[in-house]
Amino acid sequence: KEMVSYSLRLFLSTLKQAIFKKIDNEKVVAVEKLTRKDDIFKRFISIASENYLTERSIDFYAEKLCISPKYLSAVAKESSGATVMEWLNRFIITEAKSMLKCSSKSIMEIADHLNFSTPSAFGKYFKKNAGMTPGEYRNSTQIL
C-alpha cells in the first residue's frame, strides 16, 4: 500500500514537472513569435520609409520581407493597430504636409514629387486623409 502511494506521488510529481516544463516552453515560443513579428514590423517600417514615394502595394513590401502579403497585413495590424496601407498613408500625408508647410513648391510639384498621376488625384487623396484640401492646409499653416 505504501509502495503504491509512493509511486503515485512520484508519478504526479513527474507529471506536474512535465506540465510546467510544457507551459514554460510555450511561453518561450510565444515570446519568440512576438519578437519575430516585432522584427518584421520594424523592418517593414524601415523599408516603407525608404520606398513609400514609389511603392504603395502590400505585395512589394511582403516580397522584400520574404513573407506573404496576408501575413504582413496581420503583423502590421497586430503590432501597431494600423494596416499596411494606413502606415503608407501616414508617410505620404506627413511628407505632403511638410512640403505644403515648409516649401514654396506648387501643389502640382508636390503631387509630382509624391508620385501622384495628377494634382487632382493628389488633392482628392489629401482631402480624404487630412480632412482638407492641400490649398486649405497650406493656408491654415501660414504664419500671420
Question: Residue spans of the language-model regions?
Answer:
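Terminal helix-turn-helix DNA-binding modules in bacterial transcription factors
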Residues: 78-119, 139-144
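Short hydrophobic/aromatic patch on the recognition helix
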Residues: 72-73, 121-122, 126
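Short helix-to-turn junction characteristic of helix-turn-helix DNA-binding domains
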Residues: 48-52, 100-103
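Core residues of bacterial helix-turn-helix
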Residues: 65, 114-115, 126
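Short, Lys/Arg-enriched, Trp-marked, Pro/Gly-tolerant hinge/linker segments that flank
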Residues: 2, 17-42, 50, 54-60, ...
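…primarily DNA-binding HTH/wHTH and HhH modules…
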Residues: 124-144
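Residues within helix-turn-helix
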Residues: 59, 70, 106-109, 119-120, ...
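Amphipathic alpha-helical segments enriched in hydrophobic/aromatic residues interleaved with Lys/Arg
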Residues: 1-9, 14, 46
